[in-house]
Amino acid sequence: MEELLSKVKQNLILNHNEDDVLLSGFITAAISYAESYQKKPDGYYKENPMHPTTEQAVIMLSSHFYESRDGSTGGFFADKVEASQQVWHVVNMLLRLNRDVVI
């Protein structure tokens, strides 16, 4: 989790530790979303390596959660609300690359 936290902070250009607990919660939520979307069991990425495309999706989604933490479309998304939808589109596309097929 520490490595992912560092990567999310780099993505957000954060140089302080004040929001580490908050970010860790967002990372946990993003990983849970990835596991669910990819049809993997809960906790899968605690025991198995994360593919780089899945990791990028988790970084993007965690960053999106942080930037949108007040529930509005403020900050980065204030001028273009559809930019938020684009984040979800890209995240889902990246996660699809490592999705388990359930028959």
Q: Language-model segments: which ranges?
A:
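Divalent metal-cofactor coordination and adjacent catalytic microenvironments
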Residues: 1-103
